Swiss-Prot record:
This is G protein-activated inward rectifier potassium channel 4. It is found in: Membrane. Its main location: membrane. Residues 112-135, 155-163 are extracellular. The gene is Kcnj5. Residues 388-419 are annotated as: Disordered. The lineage of its organism: Eukaryota, Metazoa, Chordata, Craniata, Vertebrata. It comes from Mus musculus.
């Protein structure tokens, strides 16, 4: 029994890295990282692909179907036009102007037809409503000149046509309204900060490892631009279906993940890449999740980064998500910041890179209970990246001493007392 317990403990605690990843580890820690063995487990093995709630690009995979009250979209026409794709937006832009020009061109032609101006083309003694208007094409061109205010040239309205003067006023007013509406739509669509979010980066994976003697869920964010995001803030949500005690099934239930709201750590000064940390404590949804349970769970962590664009003052939002298969247990992010002569340099080639580190396989709840009960919880000061939790019974320790094996990461209470 003791031998089986010891072997299981060693299997849980022995985590290594490949020689290829050895270069990505900080120089001061490379000597302390063990080489990967056959017992190294990958979290993504055995997982079936599932539908994402949110793509890595931030697009939500939610389609609204069977919408009966479609008139609601027309009640907010401005937002509807802004939300259209560019090809449809340009099509609407062109069609609106063309239709208004054709409509008023037809009215100008109708006035000329009713007055009989078309029958006196070239008659010097006849005073038409619009000089040199000889047909529908001329009326259409005159409508364009009137609405775009490019100035009259060959065709011009006369003062002997009161109905033409009234139509001129109406077209000028309606033309200004159309210009304000359509140009406003185009300006808002062009100035939308969606493209600003393209230069905000999230790490490809989230990691779970020890930080300050506590299990933490971490991911990294960065900004590629020199112009910073003002008042940047980060928040995260756990998307996971659950069933209540009454038997109600809640699909895609959203649970807040504390990333520093109570301490102010969620307010970011995003000049260089930052590692966002969520402490797994009693209030965390991952409180009872161990490494083995992580491989069986199905969830998605959605992260949202918000702030104001420094150049425009408009609010920008960047989103990403991490599936359960994208959460790496026992990993840390490779440092990307180095000190050069007179400045700090960020190496984005290693922005997504992680390296493995010894991390307890038990859940945070068990880790806290073991610490409170005085059972083994020993963090070695050297090497700095090694640490673990395990129970050490007197029987297991005696067997290790007989076999001449080092205690490793587990030390008996008597040994700890002597230290």
């Amino acid at each position: 029994m003791a031998g089986d317990s010891r072997n299981a403990m060693n299997q849980d605690m022995e985590i290594g890295v490949t020689s290829q990843d050895h270069k990505k580890i900080p120089k001061q820690a490379r000597d302390y990282i063990p080489i990967a063995t056959d017992r190294t487990r990958l979290l993504t093995e055995g997982k079936k692909p599932r539908q994402r709630y949110m793509e890595k690009t931030g697009k939500c995979n939610v389609h609204h179907g069977n919408v009966q009250e479609t008139y609601r979209y027309l009640s907010d026409l401005f937002t509807t036009l802004v939300d259209l794709k560019w090809r449809f937006n340009l099509l609407v832009f062109t069609m609106v102007y063309t239709i208004t020009w054709l409509f008023f061109g037809f009215i100008w032609w109708l006035i000329a037809y009713v007055r009989g101006d078309l029958d006196h083309v070239g008659d010097q003694e006849w005073i038409p409503c619009v000089e040199n208007l000889s047909g529908f094409v001329s009326a259409f061109l005159f409508s364009i000149e009137t609405e775009t205010t490019i100035g009259y040239g060959f065709r011009v309205i006369t003062e002997k046509c009161p109905e033409g003067i009234i139509l001129l006023l109406v077209q000028a007013i309606l033309g200004s309204i159309v210009n304000a509406f359509m140009v406003g739509c185009m300006f808002v669509k062009i100035s939308q900060p969606k493209k600003r979010a393209e230069t905000l980066m999230f790490s490809n994976n989230a990691v779970i490892s020890m930080r300050d003697e506590k299990l933490c869920l971490m991911f990294r964010v960065g900004d590629l631009r020199n112009s910073h995001i003002v008042e940047a803030s980060i928040r995260a949500k756990l998307i996971k279906s659950r069933q209540t005690k009454e038997g109600e099934f809640i699909p895609l239930n959203q649970t807040d993940i504390n990333v520093g709201f109570d301490t102010g750590d969620d307010r970011l000064f995003l000049v260089s890449p930052l590692i966002i940390s969520h402490e797994i404590n009693e209030k965390s949804p991952f409180w009872e999740m161990s490494r083995a349970q992580l491989e069986q769970e199905e969830f998605e962590v959605v992260v949202i980064l918000e702030g104001m664009v420094e150049a425009t003052g408009m609010t920008c939002q960047a989103r990403s998500s991490y599936m359960d298969t994208e959460v790496l247990w026992g990993h840390r992010f490779t440092p990307v910041l180095t000190l050069e002569k007179g400045f700090y340099e960020v190496d984005y080639n290693t922005f997504h890179d992680t390296y493995e580190t010894n991390t307890p396989s038990c859940c945070a709840k068990e880790l806290a209970e073991m610490k409170r009960s005085g059972r083994l919880l020993q963090y070695l000061p050297s090497p700095p990246l090694l640490g673990g939790c395990a129970e050490a019974g007197n029987e297991a320790e005696a067997e290790k001493d007989e076999e001449g094996e080092p205690n490793g990461l587990s030390v008996s209470q008597a040994t700890r007392g002597s230290m």
